[in-house]
Each structure stands twice: as C-alpha cells, then as structure tokens.
Curated annotation (Swiss-Prot):
It is found in: Cytoplasm. Required for maturation of 30S ribosomal subunits. Its main location: cytoplasm. GO terms for biological process: ribosomal small subunit assembly; translation. The gene is rimP. This is Ribosome maturation factor RimP. One of its GO terms (cellular component) is cytosol. InterPro entries: Ribosome_maturation_RimP (IPR003728), RimP_C (IPR028998), RimP_C_sf (IPR036847), RimP_N (IPR028989), RimP_N_sf (IPR035956). Keywords: Cytoplasm, Ribosome biogenesis. Belongs to the RimP family.
Length: 158
C-alpha cells in the first residue's frame, strides 16, 4: 500500500475483512493504461481456499461502503478490482513470508544483485526475522534481507 488512498481504503475495509473472516493480502491504487485502478487482494484465513461467492459478497460490501462515505475517498473515476492473490501470490510484506513458510510451499526469489552468482533462487523459507529470510535451496542456503529482494512469489506446484 504505497500511497495514501490505498492506506485509507485498507483502514475503511478492515471491519468488512474481519466480519467476513477474510485476510487482506494487499491494497493498491495505481494508474494502468490511462485508468485508475483500486486493487484489493483478499484470501481466506488459515490457508483455506477463497471462493467466487466470497469475492462477490466482499465486492458488494465494499461497493456499498465506498458509495456511502463522505467525503469520497476516491473522488475521481476508477475501476475496482477485487480478487484472490492467486496461487503464485506476490510476497510483499514480512508477514507474507511467514504465511509462505507456514504453507510449506517453495518460493521464487529474484534479487536486485546476484547472490552466490545467481539473481533468481527457488527454495523453502527456513527462518524469518524482522530484517529478512533464510532460504534453503536444493544446493545451498541463502541469507538475505528484505531490501535485497526485487520480487518474491509463492511457487505452488500442482
């Protein structure tokens, strides 16, 4: 939630998230192809699968909430996109890494600068602290800070 609108929306929808037993993965407000997009990524708590009915119910509640708030937190035209973060969900915040570790799945990590000769690694999170993670790969252990990670996603194998 890199901006003020996303932070405000996150705060506004928190009661809806809690009432519907959901997990707020991320909120972003960006410009895409000339159009403003408010994107809200939600999931079920406890590693359960979210359904389209869950997303539809939440979307209706968010629409009703945003239509009644004065002053309007987003006075310009925008598209509302509410969805699951997906199986290959982005790992953005430190708690996302905790979630990924608990899932037992591998993650894919791309670094800004190569680690041990490679910019991309796949493995399981062994440890997490407030500064970074320890990633166990098939061949070695990589220790890194969150600041060194360019992008990380869950690597769910079906």
């Amino acid at each position: 939630m890199a901006n003020k609108v996303a932070q405000e929306i996150s705060t506004l929808i928190e009661p809806l998230i809690n009432a519907q037993q959901l997990l707020l993965w991320d909120v972003s407000y960006t410009k895409e192809g000339g159009q403003k997009v408010l994107r809200i990524l939600i999931d079920k708590r406890n590693h359960e699968f979210i359904t389209m009915d869950d997303i539809t119910t939440f979307t209706q509640a968010v629409n009703e909430l945003l239509d009644t708030i004065e002053p309007d937190p987003i006075p310009e035209a925008y598209m509302l996109d509410i969805s699951s973060p997906g199986a290959d969900r982005p790992l953005i915040r430190p708690w996302h890494y905790e979630w990924a570790k608990a899932s037992g799945e591998n993650i894919l990590v791309a670094f800004f600068v190569a680690k041990n000769g490679q910019k991309k690694w796949q493995g399981k999170i062994e440890t997490i602290d407030d500064k970074g993670i320890t990633l166990t790969t098939s061949s070695e252990t990589i220790v890194c800070t969150f600041d060194e990670i360019a992008k990380a996603v869950l690597d769910t194998q079906f």
